[in-house]
Amino acid sequence: MDMTSRMTSHFRDAMALCEQSMQALSEPLAGAVELLFAALANNGRILACGNGGSAADAQHFVAELVGRFERDRLPLAGIALNTDTSILTAVGNDYGFDEIYERQVNALGQPGDVLVAISTSGNSPNVVRAMEAARDREMHVIALTGKGGGVMGELITPHDVHLCVPHDRTMRIQEIHILLLHALCDGIDALLLGDTE
């Protein structure tokens, strides 16, 4: 395959997955918007976490909440749990990497808050433990996964939302994850500021 054809195949694969994801995830995505909006309307907070590219997605999502998405509005209460290197290194050193998010959820999370947990495999132990801590603290969880959902998919309760991308390739899952996070931001803004579309 020549390089142009190889590059073209990325667009074709992404478009096909966008269509599949639209069919599978539009309804639960709308439910996730309602969950986030309800938490914010009740003075709750949104915590987000992930590893690697998913950590970057968590940070990106929270930046859109605290800053703005496309329209000016008041800042929204969001915390990316992967951004404080002192906490991450202290907890990682003293308790182990698997606890870096769990301890923060236990410290910061309150009943009615929402944890946005991101893992392309659904099996990241530290994100799984964050979900378990969120459940113990009577928080809601929005899990962004792929590859069938893994352990995180098994932890989802009727009070949570699972956004599982129907694909096994990590980069394609990550591409849909950022689309989902942007859609969540748009939905929150539509409920806060009115629908402009």
Swiss-Prot record:
Keyword Secreted appears in the UniProt entry: no
Chain ranges of the SIS domain: 36-197
Cofactor: Zn(2+)
Positions that bind substrate: 51-53, 64, 93-94, 119-121, 124, 174
Main location: cytoplasm
PROSITE patterns: SIS
UniProt enzyme class: isomerase
UniProt-listed GO biological process terms: carbohydrate metabolic process; D-glycero-D-manno-heptose 7-phosphate biosynthetic process
Pathway linked to the protein: Carbohydrate biosynthesis; D-glycero-D-manno-heptose 7-phosphate biosynthesis; D-glycero-alpha-D-manno-heptose 7-phosphate and D-glycero-beta-D-manno-heptose 7-phosphate from sedoheptulose 7-phosphate: step 1/1
Cross-referenced CDD domains: SIS_GmhA
Keywords recorded for this protein, A-Z: Carbohydrate metabolism, Cytoplasm, Isomerase, Metal-binding, Zinc
InterPro entries reported in the protein's UniProt record: GmhA/DiaA, Phosphoheptose_Isoase, SIS_dom, SIS_dom_sf, SIS_GmhA/DiaA_subfam
Location(s) in or outside the cell: Cytoplasm
Entry EC number(s): 5.3.1.28
Catalysed reactions, semicolon-separated: 2 D-sedoheptulose 7-phosphate = D-glycero-alpha-D-manno-heptose 7-phosphate + D-glycero-beta-D-manno-heptose 7-phosphate
Cofactor, free-text remark: Binds 1 zinc ion per subunit.
One GO CC term, this protein: cytoplasm
Domain of life (superkingdom): Bacteria
GO MF annotation terms: carbohydrate derivative binding; D-sedoheptulose 7-phosphate isomerase activity; zinc ion binding
Entry-linked HAMAP family: GmhA
Biological role: Catalyzes the isomerization of sedoheptulose 7-phosphate in D-glycero-D-manno-heptose 7-phosphate.
Misc remark: The reaction produces a racemic mixture of D-glycero-alpha-D-manno-heptose 7-phosphate and D-glycero-beta-D-manno-heptose 7-phosphate.
Subunit comment: Homotetramer.
The protein's name: Phosphoheptose isomerase
Phylogenetic lineage: Bacteria, Pseudomonadati, Pseudomonadota, Betaproteobacteria, Burkholderiales
